[in-house]
Amino acid sequence: MDILSLGWSALMVVFTFSLALVVWGRNGF
């Protein structure tokens, strides 16, 4: 695995986590 795909996968994980966090916050957990 090269550094570019590693960076992209890390970015997708952070994006998905923040999106889920926003949804949870909007629903009041």
From Swiss-Prot:
TM helices/strands, residue ranges: 3-23
Gene Ontology CC: one annotated term: cytochrome b6f complex
Localization annotation: Plastid, Chloroplast thylakoid membrane
Keyword vocabulary terms for this entry: Chloroplast, Electron transport, Membrane, Photosynthesis, Plastid, Thylakoid, Transmembrane, Transmembrane helix, Transport
GO biological process, one term: photosynthesis
Source organism superkingdom: Eukaryota
Molecular functions (GO terms): electron transporter, transferring electrons within cytochrome b6/f complex of photosystem II activity
Membrane topology, as annotated: Single-pass membrane protein
Primary subcellular site in the record, as a coarse category: plastid
SUBUNIT field: The 4 large subunits of the cytochrome b6-f complex are cytochrome b6, subunit IV (17 kDa polypeptide, PetD), cytochrome f and the Rieske protein, while the 4 small subunits are PetG, PetL, PetM and PetN. The complex functions as a dimer.
Function: Component of the cytochrome b6-f complex, which mediates electron transfer between photosystem II (PSII) and photosystem I (PSI), cyclic electron flow around PSI, and state transitions.
Protein family (similarity comment): Belongs to the PetN family.
Protein name, as recorded: Cytochrome b6-f complex subunit 8
Gene designation: petN
